[in-house]
Amino acid sequence: MKGYSSKEIIKILLEDGWFEYSSATGSHHSFKHHTKKGRVVVPHPRKDLPIGTVKNIAKQAQIELI
């Protein structure tokens, strides 16, 4: 799995139908989906997210990253 920045992860989530549901006043952005359960929290801004964080975000969002 390649490394991702928080900006890239947010773009992927938005393309998959996730939307930001609370204003990002801190260092994290929260996303919800109309049909998928749960929420996804992305630390932002981060140039390079740790691989474990990226894997957890992908698992929570029910998406597959290359």
Predicted regions and their residues:
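Basic nucleic-acid-binding interfaces
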Residues: 1-66
